[in-house]
């Protein structure tokens, strides 16, 4: 018995010695860790201050022990999360050992105050747990919900498009709590009513799946049998924007994808709405129809409003600070803009782009293309910016096919130069023919109060003052974007009536 105990003790000591030698750990750079999840989500929506704990496992799939040189939270001491790695609490850990084909637990805890300002407790609280092993850096994402909100369609929808259907009835988003769109929301066989004062925040980011590949995860998409009706008021507008409200992100473009009015969707309307901080504002696809009234579209990393072979009516709308065309019309369709201000400063893209075709292959060759007649009417509107030409036209027939490119500007302020001479002088008589009566303004003309700071109200000496024509048909438009009564005889051009 004594011999057995001595042998057992000796074997145990030998094992300890072997297992604790540094050379026992693999240093192969191809030896990586595995994790039981790539994203750890905390599913609790707090109504008061509270904490939640979730866990995942770090797996060593290798046939030799491995040493994780560093485990830490990316935000460091500022992180809202705390960790417990293999029984040890903290925010940073060094030289964590995992035996061959073994695993250890990582517990993550978060404390949320849903009543804190959004700048402190955003809708989606995100963090990364970083792992450094043999020169490799790996990560596990942590996500928690920082506000008492309606997370829609689901708090687990990142990278997973979901269809909202109400069997051809309607849904009212009238909860006083904000709505957070997390993922891609398809609206089908349903009318979604969005009443005055509703706040909608869209959580964007890069996502990837087999159906769409890599794309921006954060979109509202209205399918053919779906409709969206936004019913804001001057006092209580509906605001649709990204969910990052920290100071550095408050006016940052490209945070989420945008709103798509899909092919053949009818009866969509936005009244007193603001759509901002997206890749594009609103995209109306083939044969869709859309009405915009008293709506602002701005801070986009491409175009503010896109119409492709669609029907759009816009009254008293302000579209600005867009990296692409502020308004981009392609492949024809029917468009009417009344009392709109379309402004483009600091970018090479024109404020307005109009064409009656669409290329389905390389834009330079455009061998495969769709052609459809364009009817576009602009009345009492400003199309202006910092470039020489803020209007860009594309008539696939070069003016040879009557009725294919029908454009008309009445009582408008525009800015054109090269447009009047290019395309074999096709538009040399644009001012006076298609644009009549019009003012072709220059940068020397007084127009806005302060375009450099996105104040598009009219200057006291603005050339737009009193130059519009009252619009009585097909509907009376007698107030401006801010609810100011327009002059009954000589209203001002653009979305703002100057207030004396």
Residue ranges and their predicted role:
Residues 15-18:
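C-terminal motif of bacterial Sec signal peptides marking the signal peptidase cleavage site
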Residues 74-92:
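Short, solvent-exposed loop/linker segments at beta-strand-coil boundaries, enriched for Pro/Gly
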Residues 4-13:
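Sec-dependent N-terminal signal peptides
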Residues 58-62:
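Asparagine-centered strand-capping/turn motif at beta-strand->loop junctions
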Residues 51-52, 63-68:
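Short acidic/proline- and small/hydrophobic-mixed sequence motifs that coincide with surface turns
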Residues 22-24, 33-44, 49-50, 93-103, ...:
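Beta-strand/loop edge motif enriched in small/polar residues
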